[in-house]
């Protein structure tokens, strides 16, 4: 009897999210929260997230609650672990009467599951979730992954064709293990274009130190002799653009998440476009308009869905290279080219060429 009672209670809790959604949509008082790891004005990842939710606010009149993680360690709360501090920031957002809560970044993957079970009345979206393995995604949570390796492959191909040097650079923040899809997709694109080129991969100690990024980029350009750098390092990565601009137009950079050619017009040869805002807008607007939240699953998006792409400016790349990239895009979409997202997959990819 007791087990049956517990089952009924848990079932009601799981359904609470969907009942809450419909009620909120009818009352036209939808509240959406967003938590990001860093500034929403980073000209890249978080900016894309922010643009997506601001468009929701403009189009539907929703109430928007945004918050960036506090820099760790936190002054006055040094006994907190990084995960505890992250959870505190999430709980701070949840003090508001949220209907939908977006967590932007892989570092929120575990926390999103915890929050989903704690608050079945809120629906959660996690961007760039890591592989959950045997962990079941809660019904009130949606995990979104991107096939980053597909656009990274195209970026690697372009870098290899444009570089005046025999080395290509790849700069990440401290959590580089979560960027293997980018790294090995990029490496595969380089190899596909020119097997003789070498990838120089480096890791910055922080994602929030622009000057350190500039210093590391100068070293990679001048001492490591790389011709192109692909930075995936948050604010630190912006320092690469500063270094390239100071060194001159022959020092190339690959942008990320948005077309970043405006930052360094003479240095940016292409940008990997990852329209996170588009995905957030699509899921959120479906919920707002129809009261529908399709949780409990992991979905992935890439070239085929039009969420991942690469900038192909013929004034920078020339028409021949643009045509080659378009051909590669079609081969990836059709499945003729399977882009690797890990070291093992990369070795397999090489063996088949």
Ranges and model annotations:
Residues 24-353:
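A residue-level marker of the well-folded mature domains of exported/periplasmic proteins
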Residues 15-16:
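C-terminal motif of bacterial Sec signal peptides marking the signal peptidase cleavage site
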Residues 19-22:
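Signal peptide processing junction and immediate N-terminal pro/mature segment
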Residues 2-10:
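Sec-dependent signal peptide recognition
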């Amino acid at each position: 009897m007791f087990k049956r009672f517990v089952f009924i209670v848990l079932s009601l809790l799981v359904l609470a999210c969907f009942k809450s959604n419909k009620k909120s949509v009818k009352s036209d008082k939808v509240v959406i929260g967003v938590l990001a790891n860093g500034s929403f004005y980073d000209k890249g990842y978080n900016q894309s997230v922010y643009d997506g939710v601001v468009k929701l606010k403009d189009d539907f009149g929703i109430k928007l609650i945004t918050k960036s993680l506090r820099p760790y360690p936190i002054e006055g709360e040094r006994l907190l672990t990084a995960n505890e501090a992250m959870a505190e920031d999430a709980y701070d957002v949840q003090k508001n009467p949220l209907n939908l809560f977006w967590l932007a970044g892989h570092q929120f993957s575990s926390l999103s599951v915890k929050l989903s079970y704690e608050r079945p009345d809120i629906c959660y979206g996690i961007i760039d979730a890591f592989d959950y393995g045997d962990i079941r995604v809660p019904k009130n949570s949606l995990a979104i992954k991107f096939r980053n390796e597909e656009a990274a492959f195209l970026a690697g191909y372009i870098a290899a064709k444009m570089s005046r040097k025999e080395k290509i650079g790849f700069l990440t923040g401290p959590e580089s293990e979560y960027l293997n899809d980018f790294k090995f997709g990029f490496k595969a694109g380089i190899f596909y274009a020119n097997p003789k080129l070498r990838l120089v991969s480096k890791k910055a100690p922080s994602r929030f130190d622009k000057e350190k990024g500039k210093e590391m980029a100068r070293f990679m350009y001048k001492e490591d002799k790389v011709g192109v750098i692909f930075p995936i390092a948050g604010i630190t990565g912006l320092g690469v653009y500063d270094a390239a601009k100071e060194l001159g137009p022959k020092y190339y950079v690959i942008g990320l998440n948005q077309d970043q050619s405006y930052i360094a017009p003479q240095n940016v040869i292409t940008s990997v476009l990852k329209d996170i805002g588009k995905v957030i807008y699509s899921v959120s607007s479906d919920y707002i308009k129809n009261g529908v939240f399709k949780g409990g699953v992991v979905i992935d998006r890439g070239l085929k869905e039009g969420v991942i792409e690469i900038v192909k400016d013929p004034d920078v790349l020339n028409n021949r290279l643009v045509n080659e990239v378009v051909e590669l895009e079609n081969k990836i979409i059709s499945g003729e080219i399977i882009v690797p997202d890990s070291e093992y997959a990369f070795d397999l990819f090489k063996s088949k060429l």
